[in-house]
Amino acid sequence: MSVYQKLLQIRNEKGAGFFVLLDPDKMDVPEIVKLAKKAERGGADGLLVGSSFLLSSRFDEAVKEIKANVSVPVVIFPGNANQVSRHADAILFLSLLSGRNPHFLVGEQVKAAPMIKEFGLEPIPTGYLLIESGAPTSVQFMSQTQPIPKDKPDIAKAHALAAEYLGMKFVFLEAGSGAENPVPDNIIRETSDLISIPIIVGGGIRSPEIAYNKVKNGASFVVIGNAFEEDDSIMQEFAEAIHVNKNVFPSPIEGGDKKR
């Protein structure tokens, strides 16, 4: 079974999947391994490893050590073509469709593709859409692109539909690491109602209640990063909120309970 198929199986069984984002720039290798093990024990379904900057030279070492210490899928979430490691299970093969910078639409992908082939990594084509979150984010600055306005769901929907028609397997709605505000529920809901491929949502999700609402509005996978760098004791609460088929989380919301 491919990693992609395994992730879909997790989504179908649990209602949604729970990813923890690990940034090698923000902690050393022993610390990142410790957090990875806590994430697995806390109910994470997979680990994303990546950084907007990658100031550290220990990316490959970090991926290798994480993989050696956990059994859940380890998936690279690359900021550029340098973030490729033979030790991962798969890589989100991102194309930044919300921007018009050819470097991140296809340039980095061309550089990374031969390495992905050589390493035998499973590429998961993913349409990456930045959504306005209230303040400039690292990925916005590094990619030199503007996010989709948070009050323009039709623009987000058109980009997501284009991603599906281009053959992407996921759409990633991204508010940005440490975002002031997460992706709005109505954008998730309306996009989910329009497209047939799974939606990943990340950025600015600081509480289990927020995570739950993202799932109930159509997110198939939720990514949490900064919240655990500050307090890793709440991982299980996030897992219970995201795994809506296994737990009843008391947070009523409006709309968006898409069939899966």
Regions found by a protein language model. Give the residues of each.
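N-terminal amphipathic alpha-helix/helix-capping segment at the start of soluble metabolic enzymes
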Residues: 1-22, 115-120, 124, 132
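Active-site mouth loops of central-metabolism enzymes
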Residues: 16-32, 137-155, 201
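Hydrophobic faces of well-ordered beta-strands that scaffold small-molecule active sites
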Residues: 18-22, 47-49, 74-76, 91-93, ...
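Glycine-rich phosphate-binding active-site loops on the catalytic face of alpha/beta enzymes
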Residues: 49-54, 95-104, 175, 204-205, ...
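Alpha-helix-loop-beta-strand connector modules within alpha/beta enzyme cores
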Residues: 59-80, 181-206, 238-246
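Catalytic cores of alpha/beta
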Residues: 80-93, 205-222
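Conserved anion-binding
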Residues: 83-160, 164
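Glycine/Thr-rich beta-alpha phosphate-binding loop at enzyme active sites
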Residues: 142-188, 229, 234-235
